Structures are given as structure tokens and as C-alpha cells.
């Protein structure tokens, strides 16, 4: 749902909202873009460098990376983690919230190692990372092999039940702009997650 057409209708509303030609509502608040109420960060819509999560479990200024994730996300994750544990599986958050400045250093390192073209297929440029929203995380090993593990298979089949989607699904590179990442989950709530599944 995040790379929708952005053609605005000619009769834009005065409250900062626009309707796209496909009927989606785009709103900008404090420099961040929301489409139909969902905060968006992708190759089309960047977050300002000053953006911090709106509903962090722990204030960003007091938190380490993973603890400044959204409160609702963490509640859903803990339930998903408990259900996975009951099935003998071990899932954990390996990487959560990332500040704009951290993404600058991460992206620059990838560019230095692999070049800009390659880095752009697997890493977000600063401001374009969903990690800055506090609404996504990477699980376990953050490697392609995760999809073949029992945990990866279970996540693929069940994460939507808890309000998560695999944000960069297999075969959708042209749509998302990123290669498949079985470990990268985005919290969107159960209703939208089920539709996306």
C-alpha cells in the first residue's frame, strides 16, 4: 500500500490533504507523509531528518535502538513472540528504530562497500528508511537464510495475524524498490495486514 500513485486531484482540500487519482488520501504532517492514515517512508516519501516516532514505548531520548519502537507494535510483537515460543520457535528483534543520523552512516558504509546502485537495492537512503518511523524491525539473523528457517516460515505464514506484513515480499522488487527481505516486518495493524497477506 505504500507506493501508490501520487497524482493529486485538482480540488485539493485546504486542510493539507490531497486525494490521488486512485482515491487515496495523502496528508503531510510535520514533514511526514501519511497515506490513508498510515505513516509512509519509502523511496518516494522521505521523513525529515528531525522525525522521531510518535508513539514510542520508551522516549527516543532515553532509549536504545529496539526499545523506541511503537507501543502498539511492541504489544503485538510480544504476543507474536509468545505464540512462536509456544511452538518451540525463537524470534527476536535484531534491529528496530534507527535515527536519521544512524541511517546516514549505515547507508554511506554500504555505498562505500558495494556502490550506490547496489546499496539502493537493499538499504534505504537517509530519510527513506522505515526504521526511522519506529513501526518496523528486522528479525533474528537479518540474512537471506532466515526465510528457510522454521522461524522464517512461521513468520511468513502468521505475522499478519498480529498486524505485521513482510514489507519487502518476494517477487515485488519492482514495486517496493528493494530486494526480498523475509526478516523485515512493518506494523500496520491486523486489518490492513490481513488484506496485504
Tell me what each language-model feature is.
Residues 1-96, 100-197:
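Extracytoplasmic cell-surface/polysaccharide-interacting catalytic and binding patches
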Amino acid at each position: 500500500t505504500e507506493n501508490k500513485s501520487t497524482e493529486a486531484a485538482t480540488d485539493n482540500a485546504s486542510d493539507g490533504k490531497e486525494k490521488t487519482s486512485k482515491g487515496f488520501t495523502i496528508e503531510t504532517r510535520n514533514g511526514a507523509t501519511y497515506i490513508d492514515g498510515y505513516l509512509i517512508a519509502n523511496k518516494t516519501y522521505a521523513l525529515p531528518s528531525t522525525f522521531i516516532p510518535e508513539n514510542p514505548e520508551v522516549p527516543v531520548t532515553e532509549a536504545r535502538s529496539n526499545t523506541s519502537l511503537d507501543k502498539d507494535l511492541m504489544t503485538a510483537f510480544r504476543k507474536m513472540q509468545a505464540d512462536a515460543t509456544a511452538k518451540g520457535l525463537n524470534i527476536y528483534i535484531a534491529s528496530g528504530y534507527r535515527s536519521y543520523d544512524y541511517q546516514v552512516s549505515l547507508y554511506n558504509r554500504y555505498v562505500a562497500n558495494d556502490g550506490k546502485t547496489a546499496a539502493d537495492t537493499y538499504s534505504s537512503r537517509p530519510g527513506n528508511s522505515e526504521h526511522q518511523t519506529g513501526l518496523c524491525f528486522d528479525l533474528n539473523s537479518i540474512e537471506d537464510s532466515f526465510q528457510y528457517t522454521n522461524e522464517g516460515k512461521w513468520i511468513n505464514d502468521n505475522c499478519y495475524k498480529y498486524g505485521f506484513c513482510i514489507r519487502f515480499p518476494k517477487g515485488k522488487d519492482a514495486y517496493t524498490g528493494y530486494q526480498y527481505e523475509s526478516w523485515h516486518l512493518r506494523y500496520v495493524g491486523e486489518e490492513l495486514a490481513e488484506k496485504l497477506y
